[in-house]
Amino acid sequence: SPPAHPHVDHAKNLLRWEPWVRTSVALTELMEGLTFKASDGNPESSFALFRGGDALITLKRPPEVFFMAQLRLVQSWAELREERAAEILTQIDNQIAFQGAVTGLNATRHRWSMEWLNIGLQFAVAVEMRFKQALGCRRPVEYSAQVQPIITTPLHGTYPMGHAVQAYLVARLLQTLGGWSNDHPRTTQLQRQAQRISTNRIVAGLHFPVDATAGQVMGETLAEYFLARCGVKPIDGVKARSYVQKFKEAKGG
């Protein structure tokens, strides 16, 4: 006789599928209950991710003159390009290797952990791209041809920085996997690595410093939310974060 069907929507079905299928199913679950819209407080320049009726992440778009002022920083950091070129090229699509080096993460030994981290990264990409679309901020090279990025500038907005979102999310997830406190040496190293990955994107000429700050805010919040949806912590314990300060246009920072 043929094998009996499993129960409808049984979690054990996931073990039968390819990783990309599990990721697609997980993303559907993660995005459930989340909505995006202009912030009620400042709809002309702020955009937010809502869970129910509460804002989970709110980002304010810096004015154009602020980005112009930060061009000086982007151009000055270009001095580090020769030193960091190898890192910049490797980190285009592979951040986990750098942070995994802190924890001994191995794709063969830690297959399920790698798949779990990838689901978290795909979740981060889905959210960050919605913010980039909404806020529509131009890249450094669109303000000045003298920036001359050393790699191709991606065709999506500069703010927030996607690599920062993903780097800080991975740092938090690896900290949780390791069971390390916030002041543990490995946690500190993971945070430093996330900061360096973010800085490298500025050095490459792809981003402004403010993009990294907004990305950190988003990455840490999404990590908490992801962990809550995985049952690691209460969903109501996720801290809402915002980056809505008054930007100091004259100083560019």
What are these regions (language model features)?
Residues 114-118, 156-157:
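Second-shell loop/turn segments in exported
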Residues 1-113, 128-142:
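N-terminal transmembrane-helix/juxtamembrane module of multi-pass inner/ER membrane proteins
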Residues 5-8, 76, 87, 105, ...:
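Short, flexible coil/linker segments at or flanking structured domains
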Residues 133, 137-253:
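Membrane-embedded catalytic cores of phosphoryl/pyrophosphoryl-handling enzymes
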Residues 120-128:
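Alpha-helical transition-metal enzyme core signature, strongest for iron centers
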